[in-house]
């Protein structure tokens, strides 16, 4: 009886594990390793006998596996409290759903009926009782024909209440409730409620509620609520709420809320809220809120907010806010805010803000702000701000600002500012500013400024400034300034200035200045100045000056000056001066002077002078003088005098006099006199005199004199004199003199003199002199002199001199001199000199000199010199020199020199030199040189040289040279040279050379050379050469050469050569050559040759040759030859030859030839031998052999004629 079997029902998890972690098999034996024969639940396998009794071992999860197992009756132990049965081992006979498991038991119970006595009861409903008690409800098996059994379980029901539980459960249900729970669970339900939970769960609900949860979950719901959750979840809901969550989730909701979330999520909602989230998300919402998020997201919202976000996003919102964002985004908003962003974006906003941005953007806004931006943008705004920008832009604004910009722009604004800009622009503004600019512009403004500019413009303004400019303009203004300019203009102003100019103009003003000018004008003003000029005019003024001029005029004024002039006029005034002139006039005044003249007049005045003259007049006056003259007058005044003269006048004054004269006047003054004269005047003054003259004047003064002259003047001064002259002047001064001259002037000074000249001047100075000259000047200085000259100047200095010149100048310096020159200059320096020159210059230096030159320059240096030059320059250096040059330059150096040049340069170096050049350069080097060149270069070197060149270059080297070249290059070398080239190159070398080339190259070498080439290359070599080539190459070699080629190559060799080729190659060799080739090759050789080829080959040789080939080949040879081939071959030979072929081959021999057919009989090879001229075998007739070893004549129509077999040798 104890060995009989019974059926036990239980459930496992979806992965076939029970609550203790034991994995049950699908079918077969299962055993408990920790079995103890007690009535406790632990240490054993458990279940419901015949599926009846307590349901403690049964799970209500939808994915649970229902297991039916067979247990030996003797192993059964009935557990306490009617909790089922316990057993140490069992055999699983069925795994499926609840329905299939119960069906299996019903179908198989009759098989165990003999052993079922007193173990089975028929399931019946008990009478309904009113009390509630802790019970273990039974799980029924609804079959009517099951045998009677012992009473091992009891079923009890409350009034209109259905309760189903297992051991350790507590169920309390009100009227019309249904409670189902696993073991160890606690459920409490109000009226008309339904609670279903797994083991270890806790469920509490009000009336009309529904709770469904997995094992270990906790559900608490008010009335009219619905809770659904996976195992291990916690749900708490007020009335009229609906909560749905996956396993391990936590949901808390007040009255009227709807929460839906994936597993592992956390949801907290106030009344009347709706939360939807993916697994692992966290949602917290106040009342009347709606939150929707993807998995792994976090959302926090106050009352009345609406949040929508993709997976992995974070949203935080105050009350009545709306947030919409893509996956991975972060949004933080105060109340009454609306945020919309693409994936991966970050948005932060205070109360009442509206933010919209593309993916990957960052937005930060204060209260009541509006931000709109494209993807990848960054926006930061204070309260009550509005920002709009294209993708990739950056905008930063304080409270109350409005910013609008195109893509890729940058905007920074203070409070209450307005910025509008095109794409790629940069705007920075202080508070209460307004900036408007086209694309690519840059604007910077302080508080309260207004800037408007076209595209590509630059505007910088202080506080309370207004800037308006066309495209491409540049404006810089201090506070309280107003600037207006056309396109391409430049305006710079300090605080409180007002500038207005046409297009292409330049305006520079100090504080509180006003500038008005036409297009193309230039204005420069100090503070508190007012400048007005027509188009193309130039005005320069210091603080507090007022200048007014017509178009094309030039005005220069000191501080607190007033200048008024017609169009085309020129005015120059010191401080506190007033100048008034008609159109085309020229006025020059020192400080405190007052000049008034008609049109076309010229006025020159010292300080605190007053000059009045008619139109076309010339006035020259010293300090504290007053001159008045008509046009064409001449004025001469003594010391402290005041002279006034008209056109062409002559003025003469003694010491302390002040002279003023018109054009063409002559002035003579004593010592301490001040002379001022017009154009073409002549002035002579005594000791300590001050002379001022116009254009073309002549001035002569003794010691301590100060001379000032106009254009073309001549000045002569004594000791310690100071001379200033205009263009084309001539000045001669004694010791320690200071000379200043205009363009084309000539200055001569002795020791310790300082000379300054204009363009085209000539200066000569003694010892320790300092010379400065303009363009085209000529300067000559003694020892330790410093010379500075403009363009086209000529400077000559002795030892330890410092020379600086402009473009096109000529400099000559002595020992240890340093020379600097502009473009196109010519410099010649002595020993240890340093020369620097601009473009197109010519420099010549001796030993140990350092030369630096610009583009197109010519440099020549002595021993151990270092030369650096620009593009297209020519450099020549002595021994051990280092030369560096730009593109297209020409470098020539002697022995042991290092040369570096740019593209297209030409280099020539002596012995042991190293040359490096750019593309297309030409290099020539002496013995033992190293050459490196770019693409398409030409290199020539003597013996023991190393050449490296780029693509398409040409290299020629002497004996024992090494050449490396790029693609398509041409290399020519002497004997014992090593050549390496790229694809398609041409190599020519002398005897005993090694040549290596890329694909498609052509190689030609002398005797005893080794040639290696890539695919498709051509090689030609003299006697005793070794050739190696890639696929499809062509090789031609002299006598006694060895050729190796790849497949499909063509080889031609002289007598006694050895040829080795790949398949499909063509070989031609002279007499007594040895040819070896792969399959599909063609071999042609002269007499006494040896040919070896693979299958599908074609071999042709002269007399006394030996031909060996594979199957399917054609062999042709002259007399006295030996031909051996495989199957299906055609062998043809001359007289006295020996032909060997296998089955399927055709043999044709000349007179007295032997034909041998190799036959296979299944065990061994046998030979069928015939001879021409005997046995009815004719010469020059093709013969074959059939499968029966019969020799047949191969007819032209492919028909076979048998030969007398009796005559055939076995």
UniProtKB/Swiss-Prot annotation:
GO molecular function: ice binding
Stretches that traverse the bilayer: none
Protein name: Ice nucleation protein
Localization: Cell outer membrane
Gene of this entry: inaW
Membrane as UniProt keyword: yes
Similarity field: Belongs to the bacterial ice nucleation protein family.
Major place of residence: membrane
Gene Ontology cellular-component annotations: cell outer membrane
Domain notes: Contains 122 imperfect repeats of a consensus octapeptide A-G-Y-G-S-T-L-T; further on a 16-residue and a regional 48-residue periodicity is superimposed.
InterPro entries, alphabetized: Ice_nucleatn
Region annotation (Octapeptide periodicity) ranges: 165-1156
SUPFAM superfamilies, sorted: Phage fibre proteins
Function: Ice nucleation proteins enable bacteria to nucleate crystallization in supercooled water.
Record organism: Pseudomonas fluorescens
Topology term for the membrane: Peripheral membrane protein
């Amino acid at each position: 009886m104890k060995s009989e079997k019974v059926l036990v029902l239980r459930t496992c998890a979806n992965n076939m594990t029970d609550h203790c972690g034991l994995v049950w098999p699908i079918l077969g034996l299962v055993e408990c390793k920790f079995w103890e024969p007690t009535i406790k639940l632990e240490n054993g396998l458990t279940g419901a006998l015949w599926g009846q009794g307590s349901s403690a071992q049964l799970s209500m999860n939808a994915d649970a596996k229902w297991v039916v197992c067979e247990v030996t009756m003797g192993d059964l132990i009935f557990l306490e409290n009617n909790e089922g049965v316990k057993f140490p081992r069992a055999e699983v006979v069925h795994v499926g759903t609840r329905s299939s498991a119960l069906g299996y038991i019903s179908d198989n119970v009759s098989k165990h009926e003999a052993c079922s006595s007193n173990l089975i009861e028929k399931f019946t409903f008990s009478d309904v009782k009113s009390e509630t008690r802790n019970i273990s409800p039974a799980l029924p098996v609804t079959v009517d024909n099951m045998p009677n059994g012992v009473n091992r379980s009891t079923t009890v029901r409350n009034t209109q209440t259905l309760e189903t539980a297992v051991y350790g459960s507590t169920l309390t249900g009100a009227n019309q409730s249904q409670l189902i729970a696993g073991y160890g669970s606690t459920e409490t339900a109000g009226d008309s409620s339904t609670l279903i939970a797994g083991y270890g769960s806790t469920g509490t609900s009000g009336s009309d509620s529904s709770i469904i949860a997995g094992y270990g979950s906790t559900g608490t719901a008010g009335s009219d609520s619905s809770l659904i959750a996976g195992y291990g979840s916690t749900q708490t809901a007020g009335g009229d709420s609906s909560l749905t969550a996956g396993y391990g989730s936590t949901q808390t909701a007040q009255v009227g809320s709807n929460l839906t979330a994936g597993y592992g999520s956390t949801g907290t909602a106030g009344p009347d809220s709706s939360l939807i989230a993916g697994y692992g998300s966290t949602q917290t919402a106040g009342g009347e809120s709606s939150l929707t998020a993807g998995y792994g997201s976090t959302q926090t919202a106050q009352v009345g907010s609406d949040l929508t976000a993709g997976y992995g996003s974070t949203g935080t919102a105050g009350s009545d806010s709306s947030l919409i964002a893509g996956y991975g985004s972060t949004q933080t908003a105060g109340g009454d805010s609306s945020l919309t962003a693409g994936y991966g974006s970050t948005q932060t906003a205070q109360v009442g803000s509206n933010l919209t941005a593309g993916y990957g953007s960052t937005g930060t806004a204060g209260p009541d702000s509006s931000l709109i931006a494209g993807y990848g943008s960054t926006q930061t705004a204070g309260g009550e701000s509005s920002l709009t920008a294209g993708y990739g832009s950056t905008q930063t604004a304080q409270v109350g600002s409005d910013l609008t910009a195109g893509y890729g722009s940058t905007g920074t604004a203070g409070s209450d500012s307005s910025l509008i800009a095109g794409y790629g622009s940069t705007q920075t503004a202080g508070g209460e500013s307004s900036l408007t600019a086209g694309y690519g512009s840059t604007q910077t403004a302080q508080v309260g400024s207004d800037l408007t500019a076209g595209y590509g413009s630059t505007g910088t303004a202080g506080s309370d400034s207004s800037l308006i400019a066309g495209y491409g303009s540049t404006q810089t203004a201090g506070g309280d300034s107003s600037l207006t300019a056309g396109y391409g203009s430049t305006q710079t102003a300090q605080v409180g200035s007002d500038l207005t100019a046409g297009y292409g103009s330049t305006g520079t003003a100090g504080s509180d200045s006003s500038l008005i000018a036409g297009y193309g004008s230039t204005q420069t003003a100090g503070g508190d100045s007012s400048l007005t000029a027509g188009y193309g005019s130039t005005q320069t003024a210091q603080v507090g000056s007022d200048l007014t001029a017509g178009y094309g005029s030039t005005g220069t004024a000191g501080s607190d000056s007033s200048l008024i002039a017609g169009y085309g006029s020129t005015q120059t005034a010191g401080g506190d001066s007033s100048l008034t002139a008609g159109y085309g006039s020229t006025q020059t005044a020192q400080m405190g002077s007052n000049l008034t003249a008609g049109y076309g007049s010229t006025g020159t005045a010292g300080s605190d002078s007053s000059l009045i003259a008619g139109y076309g007049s010339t006035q020259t006056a010293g300090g504290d003088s007053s001159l008045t003259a008509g046009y064409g007058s001449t004025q001469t005044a003594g010391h402290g005098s005041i002279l006034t003269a008209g056109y062409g006048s002559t003025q003469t004054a003694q010491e302390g006099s002040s002279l003023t004269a018109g054009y063409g006047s002559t002035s003579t003054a004593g010592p301490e006199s001040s002379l001022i004269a017009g154009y073409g005047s002549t002035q002579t003054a005594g000791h300590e005199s001050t002379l001022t003259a116009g254009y073309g004047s002549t001035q002569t003064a003794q010691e301590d004199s100060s001379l000032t002259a106009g254009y073309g003047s001549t000045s002569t001064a004594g000791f310690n004199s100071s001379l200033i002259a205009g263009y084309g002047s001539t000045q001669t001064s004694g010791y320690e003199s200071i000379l200043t001259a205009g363009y084309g002037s000539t200055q001569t000074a002795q020791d310790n003199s300082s000379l300054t000249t204009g363009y085209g001047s000539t200066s000569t100075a003694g010892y320790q002199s300092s010379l400065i000259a303009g363009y085209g000047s000529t300067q000559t200085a003694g020892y330790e002199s410093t010379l500075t000259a403009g363009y086209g100047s000529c400077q000559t200095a002795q030892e330890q001199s410092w020379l600086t010149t402009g473009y096109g100048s000529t400099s000559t310096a002595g020992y240890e001199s340093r020379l600097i020159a502009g473009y196109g200059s010519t410099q010649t320096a002595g020993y240890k000199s340093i020369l620097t020159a601009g473009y197109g210059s010519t420099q010549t230096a001796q030993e140990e000199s350092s030369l630096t030159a610009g583009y197109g320059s010519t440099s020549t240096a002595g021993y151990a010199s270092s030369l650096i030059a620009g593009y297209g320059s020519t450099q020549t250096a002595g021994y051990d020199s280092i030369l560096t040059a730009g593109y297209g330059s020409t470098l020539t150096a002697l022995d042991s020199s290092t040369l570096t040049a740019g593209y297209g340069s030409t280099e020539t170096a002596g012995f042991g030199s190293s040359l490096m050049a750019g593309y297309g350069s030409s290099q020539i080097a002496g013995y033992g040189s190293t050459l490196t060149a770019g693409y398409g270069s030409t290199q020539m070197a003597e013996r023991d040289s190393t050449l490296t060149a780029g693509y398409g270059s040409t290299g020629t080297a002497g004996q024992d040279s090494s050449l490396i070249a790029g693609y398509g290059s041409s290399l020519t070398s002497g004997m014992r040279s090593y050549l390496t080239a790229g694809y398609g190159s041409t190599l020519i070398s002398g005897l005993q050379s090694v040549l290596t080339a890329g694909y498609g190259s052509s190689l030609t070498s002398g005797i005893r050379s080794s040639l290696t080439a890539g695919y498709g290359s051509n090689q030609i070599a003299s006697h005793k050469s070794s050739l190696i080539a890639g696929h499809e190459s062509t090789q031609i070699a002299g006598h006694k050469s060895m050729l190796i080629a790849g497949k499909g190559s063509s080889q031609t060799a002289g007598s006694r050569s050895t040829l080795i080729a790949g398949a499909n190659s063509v070989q031609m060799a002279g007499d007594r050559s040895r040819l070896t080739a792969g399959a599909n090759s063609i071999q042609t050789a002269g007499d006494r040759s040896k040919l070896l080829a693979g299958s599908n080959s074609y071999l042709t040789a002269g007399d006394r040759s030996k031909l060996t080939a594979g199957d399917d080949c054609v062999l042709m040879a002259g007399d006295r030859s030996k031909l051996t081939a495989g199957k299906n071959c055609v062998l043809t030979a001359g007289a006295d030859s020996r032909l060997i072929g296998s089955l399927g081959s055709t043999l044709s021999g000349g007179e007295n030839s032997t034909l041998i057919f190799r036959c296979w009989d299944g065990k061994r090879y046998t030979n069928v031998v015939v001879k021409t001229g005997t046995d009815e075998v004719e010469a020059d007739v093709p013969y074959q052999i059939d499968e029966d070893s019969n020799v047949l004549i191969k007819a032209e129509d492919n028909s076979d004629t048998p030969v007398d077999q009796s005559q055939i040798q076995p």
